[in-house]
Structure formats: structure tokens, C-alpha cells
């Protein structure tokens, strides 16, 4: 017998039967990196970025955990002196062609008395979302970006390595 009173014989072979089950079990995972360079967005409507990945759920009851990390630089500028300005970059997640989440924004602001200057904010924006797509067909998730310039002008730049991870979990 491989199992004694209190010891497990580690040199023996064991066979386990049955399936691992239960909510939260990871069924599959997709991961993608994107090297972004010189991507500049000045549109006040959402524009698709290159950050995308897709997954085909194995059951309609599955949950998809989406995690994304995006390098964002928001620049606000004013071409005439003596003005305050402010710009904000917005990042949204789309499932296929439908906006799914829009809860992340970063802003740059400043004040100048010179002929041209700018204020900015930069960093990595990181999020996790839990989705219930209720399908066994392929589902594509994509990051969209837009600018809102409340005063002056501005732009959102994506520069650096972005990533997106999709994890199907049993519900």
C-alpha cells in the first residue's frame, strides 16, 4: 500500500479519477503584448487602438476576466499665453463592436504666460474587468482611446509596451 498510517510514499505512482470542478477554475487563458510607438490620438470620439485579443468561451455560463495595462501620456497645450488649459484621455474596453466599460481617464493641465507650453500626465493605466459574454462563439476585446480637451488643445499618446490578458473561468 502506497499510503501508510502517516506517510505518503513519494516514489510510488498514484492515479486520480474525476474532474476538477467548481466556480473560479481557470479553463483557458490568452495573453498578448503590444509594442506601441508614436501612437497619437487627438480625436474626441473613441478610436480603436492596436491592443486587442479574442477568446472562445467553452460554456455560455463562463466568466471572462480581462486585465489590461496601457502606457498613457496625456498632453494639454495652449498656443497663446496667459491661459489655463486642461485635457483628459479616456480609455474604454469594447467587446466586439460594443462599448463595455468606460471608467478610466487621466488628465493633464497647466498654465503658461509664454507663447507655447504644455502640461502633461503620464503613466501606466491598469484595469481588470469581469465579463459574462453568454456565448460559445469567439469574443474580441479591444481598447479604444479618445481625447477630451476642455480648454486649449491636447493629445493622448500611447508609447511603450501594452498588454491584455483574457482568462476564462468556470462560473
Residue locations for each model-derived region?
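Glycine-rich, low-complexity segments
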Residues: 1-38, 171
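Intrinsic disorder/low-complexity segments
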Residues: 3-5, 13-16, 20, 49, ...
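Terminal beta-strand-rich extracellular "head" domains
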Residues: 32-45, 56-138, 142-171
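Extended, low-complexity regulatory regions
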Residues: 51-53
Amino acid at each position: 500500500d502506497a499510503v501508510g498510517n502517516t506517510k505518503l510514499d513519494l516514489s510510488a505512482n498514484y492515479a486520480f479519477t474525476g474532474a476538477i470542478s467548481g466556480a473560479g477554475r481557470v479553463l483557458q487563458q490568452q495573453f498578448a503584448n503590444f509594442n506601441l510607438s508614436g501612437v497619437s490620438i487627438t480625436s474626441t470620439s473613441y478610436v480603436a487602438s492596436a491592443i486587442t485579443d479574442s477568446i472562445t468561451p467553452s460554456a455560455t455560463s463562463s466568466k471572462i476576466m480581462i486585465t489590461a495595462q496601457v502606457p498613457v501620456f496625456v498632453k494639454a497645450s495652449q498656443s497663446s499665453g496667459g491661459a489655463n488649459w486642461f485635457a483628459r484621455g479616456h480609455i474604454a474596453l469594447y467587446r466586439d463592436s460594443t462599448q463595455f466599460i468606460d471608467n478610466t481617464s487621466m488628465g493633464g493641465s497647466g498654465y503658461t504666460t509664454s507663447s507655447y507650453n504644455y502640461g502633461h500626465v503620464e503613466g501606466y493605466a491598469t484595469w481588470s474587468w469581469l465579463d459574462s459574454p453568454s456565448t460559445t462563439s469567439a469574443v474580441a476585446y479591444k481598447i479604444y482611446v479618445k481625447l477630451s480637451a476642455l480648454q486649449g488643445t491636447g493629445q493622448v499618446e500611447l508609447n511603450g509596451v501594452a498588454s491584455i490578458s483574457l482568462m476564462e473561468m468556470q462560473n
